[in-house]
Structure formats: structure tokens, C-alpha cells
Amino acid sequence: MKKILFVVATIFMALFLNAKENDMRNLKDIYLAGGCFWGTQAYFDKIRGVIKTDVGYANGKSDKTDYHSLHYSGHAETVHITFDENIVSLAEILAHYFRIIDPFSVNKQGNDVGSQYRTGIYYNDSSLKNSISEFIKHEQTKYDKKIAVEVEPLKNYVLAEDYHQKYLDKNPGGYCHVDLSLADKPLYNESKFKAPSKDELKAKLSDLQYSVTQEKATERPYSSEYDKFDKKGIYVDIVSKKPLFSSSDKFDAGCGWPSFTKPITTDALGYNRDLSHGMERVEVTSNLANSHLGHVFTDGPKDKGGLRYCINGASLKFIPLEDMEKEGYKDYIIYVK
């Protein structure tokens, strides 16, 4: 499994780096306090689209502190994350964050107790404030208990000592309150998404849907109802019903097929080298059912990262925003703007 993931990651990164000739990145910074920063940093270093991280102390009383003074200075152990929003959305970053914290615990995460171990989301870019607030509001609907994560502008961030930077890289097996294996698993529960048998698919899918998803056929350009489609919602795999793309990332490429700048989450798709028809391309598949979707090219909008996911409409099913909750896609509403 690890070998497969490495090959997929290698194909993706080679493709993406090729699209980055003019540095078409959209870098953003977020500061996350989630208990002991050793484990939190190690977790986010595994997430695709995270460019770099460092650990420090945030939102204390002054611009000076150190590890041994946190009890007095009021700072929280915090991970500074720089991510490329053209690869991974802030919503996905925050979904990962909530995955590894207890959002109701006050001044305690894992075995660590004290105000320095409180949870917090801090920002130095006011344009992120509304997105963070919307995410928290959406997350709160899942619980009766009030979320205890503080959301504030960043202040008095102090870089931690070298000893703490990449601590678990330097000390494998060191103390960690975070289950790092979660970073290699699907972000959301996929138990409700199934890959039917070939016989079931032949009975459920149209001839075109079957030939595209199972036999790697290509629909005629300009033939899909989704080509010029611009309603808000998500596009799911016609086979497994797993979410693949958001309408927020859809654009009209003029090529005759539905086009997107990125998948809805970084774990939604698979990538394969395709040498068919005398060309070298990157095939895009659904990660769960391995349905053929189309290909990804490096001629997309530069301000969105330069990628164009050229997708057969026959491989997709659209779920309108207003129907997402009743159809079982509540977790994904936050990805639709």
C-alpha cells in the first residue's frame, strides 16, 4: 500500500511541479494550537499541499517567552502552517485539525494540561476570518456541546527553540498525543460509499457511463449536461457516490468537457501514467472505486495553480447544495462557496 501511495504522490507532484514553472502558488498561513506541538506539526507535515511548518508560541501577553515560561506568559503551543490554497483548501486544513483535537476540552489535550495546551486558530490575514468562522459554525452543528476552540487574530508569535522544531523527525517514537496514522487515511468516513460489482454497474449505469468509468472511454466533447453547468453543489463519482469536485473549483475551459482546478479534497482522486493513443498523459480516477474520470493537464488558470482536470461528465453525478445534507453530504457543505 505504501508503495502505491508513493507512486501516486510521485506522479502528482511531478505534474504539479511542472505546472509551477512561474510559481503559480497561492500561499496562505494559518496558526493552529492543538496541544503539544510535536505531534500536531508531524501530522500536518504529512498533508498534501502543506508547504512548510514551524512551531512556536502564540497569543500570549508579550512578544517574548520560551518553553519554560509559558505558564506565566500565557502563550499557546502553536504550529505555523504555510499551505498552497491551490492544492488544499483552508476548510480541509481545518477538518484535519478538528480530527486530531478534542474541541471541547479546555486547557488540556491528551495527557498535557495547562493553558499552553489550549486549542486555538489564529490568523494574520483578515481575509481568512470569515472562512474560519463559517467552518466553526458548520462544525458546531454536529454537536450539542459548545466548541471550546478560540479564534483570534495572531499576536506575539514567538518561534520555538530549535530543539522543538520537527521534534518527531529527530526523535522517532518520541512522545506524541496525535495518531499520526490518521494522516494516511481518508479524511471522512467512507463506509457509506461502495464500489459495486461489474454486474451491478451494468444494470445501474447507462452504456456511456459504464464505458467511460469501466473501460476508459471518452464522451464526445460538448455532449455533457455538466459542460456549461454552473449551479452550486458537489460532483460525486457516479459509481461509488464519493465526492470528487466542488462547484467552487469548476470553470469553463472551452474544451467541451467539465473542467475543475482541483479536487474537493486532496484524497479524493488517484493518478496514473497514461501512454495510450501515442500520448503521455496523467489519468485521473476516483480513489475509492478506481473509476476512470478523465485526465489532468497543466494548461489551467494560472491564478488557480495551473491545473485543468478535464473530466467526463458521464463519470459524475451532481448534488445541489440545497440537497447535500439530506443526501448524506453534510460534511462537504463547507467546500461549496
From Swiss-Prot:
InterPro entries xref list: Met_Sox_Rdtase_MsrA_dom, Met_Sox_Rdtase_MsrA_sf, Met_Sox_Rdtase_MsrB, Met_Sox_Rdtase_MsrB_dom, Mss4-like_sf
Record field: catalytic activity: L-methionyl-[protein] + [thioredoxin]-disulfide + H2O = L-methionyl-(S)-S-oxide-[protein] + [thioredoxin]-dithiol; [thioredoxin]-disulfide + L-methionine + H2O = L-methionine (S)-S-oxide + [thioredoxin]-dithiol; L-methionyl-[protein] + [thioredoxin]-disulfide + H2O = L-methionyl-(R)-S-oxide-[protein] + [thioredoxin]-dithiol
Record keyword Ribonucleoprotein present: no
Enzyme class: oxidoreductase
Keyword Transmembrane helix: no
Keywords (A to Z) from UniProt: Multifunctional enzyme, Oxidoreductase
Short name of any one Pfam family annotated for the protein: PMSR
GO biological process, one term: response to oxidative stress
Chain positions covered by the region annotation Peptide methionine sulfoxide reductase A: 28-181
Listed SUPFAM superfamilies: Mss4-like, Peptide methionine sulfoxide reductase
GO molecular function per UniProt: L-methionine:thioredoxin-disulfide S-oxidoreductase activity; peptide-methionine (R)-S-oxide reductase activity; peptide-methionine (S)-S-oxide reductase activity
PROSITE patterns: MSRB
Domain MsrB: 198-321
Catalytic site positions: 36, 310 (nucleophile)
GO cellular component: cytoplasm
EC number: 1.8.4.11, 1.8.4.12
PANTHER family in the record: METHIONINE SULFOXIDE REDUCTASE (PTHR10173), METHIONINE-R-SULFOXIDE REDUCTASE B1 (PTHR10173:SF52)
HAMAP family in the cross-refs: MsrA (MF_01401), MsrB (MF_01400)
Family note: In the N-terminal section; belongs to the MsrA Met sulfoxide reductase family. In the C-terminal section; belongs to the MsrB Met sulfoxide reductase family.
Role of this protein: Has an important function as a repair enzyme for proteins that have been inactivated by oxidation. Catalyzes the reversible oxidation-reduction of methionine sulfoxide in proteins to methionine.
Entries under NCBIfam families matching the protein: msrA, peptide-methionine (R)-S-oxide reductase MsrB
Name of the protein in question: Peptide methionine sulfoxide reductase MsrA/MsrB
Source organism of this protein record: Campylobacter fetus
Upper taxonomic lineage: Bacteria, Pseudomonadati, Campylobacterota, Epsilonproteobacteria, Campylobacterales
